[in-house]
């Protein structure tokens, strides 16, 4: 029975891998782990993070972040809007943020030192949510681990459902922590794509897309010419990125103004 389950799991993973097109027209190879299981792993990772890392006790920070998250989420495709998005603020001075499949968003308190108003915070959050809706986590797992690595992840799910023996058999040769999978650094192509998706999302939500430029200027200044903050470490060249954001912002101002005219006027802070 165990061998049959493992064979079925392996076959399902291989069959599920597929080529698709990203929001910017880039070819992606995805599907090593089915979406519902990615969502489950995202939720699991989020629970683990909240259990291991200190959460901010500042309720105004929590309310502020949730307000921005929900404003951005309202502009997502219907299937993503249907998810109950959840956010958390971690008591960590590093200017970092993330979003996970399954509708989970985490923000460090350190981000408030560089995201100095709600529009700049929206630029951070929309960028991270952009990774989720562009299936970048799925793409990274499929590319870096393939069916063999994904099988180790699914082994944990099989173990939870069918017994520890099945799970251990599936994960022979090592284990991959769900948290590690989801926090793998993105490629520069993915980061640029998340910029494009995120800047449009924030404009449609009624946040000024020009403030994305200010955010990145603040991030560069915060690095002090030394090693960039973790959030910047795998991202494209900062100056080139700012130039691209300025160009996009000009074309997105009408989208932002239309959103504001239609009543999308976030008042998160």
What are these regions (language model features)?
Residues 2-6, 17-269:
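A Zn2+-metalloprotease active-site environment signal
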């Amino acid at each position: 029975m165990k061998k049959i389950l493992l064979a079925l799991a392996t076959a399902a993973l291989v069959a599920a891998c597929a080529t698709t097109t990203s929001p910017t027209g880039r070819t992606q190879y995805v599907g090593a782990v089915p979406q519902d299981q990615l969502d489950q792993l995202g939720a699991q990772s989020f629970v683990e993070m909240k259990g291991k890392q200190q959460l901010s006790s500042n309720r105004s920070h929590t309310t502020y972040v949730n307000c921005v998250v929900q404003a951005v989420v309202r502009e997502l495709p219907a299937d993503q809007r249907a998810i109950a998005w959840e956010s958390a603020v971690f008591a960590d001075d590093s200017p970092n943020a993330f979003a996970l499949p399954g509708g989970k968003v985490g923000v460090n308190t350190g981000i408030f030192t560089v995201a100095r108003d709600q529009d700049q915070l929206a630029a951070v959050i929309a960028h991270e949510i952009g990774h989720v809706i562009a299936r970048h986590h799925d793409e990274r797992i499929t590319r870096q681990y393939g069916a063999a690595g994904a099988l180790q992840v699914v082994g944990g799910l099989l173990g939870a459902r069918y017994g520890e023996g099945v799970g251990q058999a599936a994960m022979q040769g090592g284990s991959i922590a769900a948290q590690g999978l989801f926090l793998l650094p993105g490629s520069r192509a993915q980061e640029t794509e998340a910029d494009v998706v995120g800047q449009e999302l924030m404009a449609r939500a009624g946040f000024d897309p020009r403030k994305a430029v200010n955010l990145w200027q603040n991030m560069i200044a915060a690095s002090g010419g030394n090693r960039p903050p973790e959030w910047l470490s795998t991202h494209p060249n900062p100056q080139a990125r700012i130039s691209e954001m300025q160009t996009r912002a000009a074309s997105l101002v009408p989208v932002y103004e239309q959103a504001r005219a239609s009543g999308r006027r976030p008042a998160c802070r």
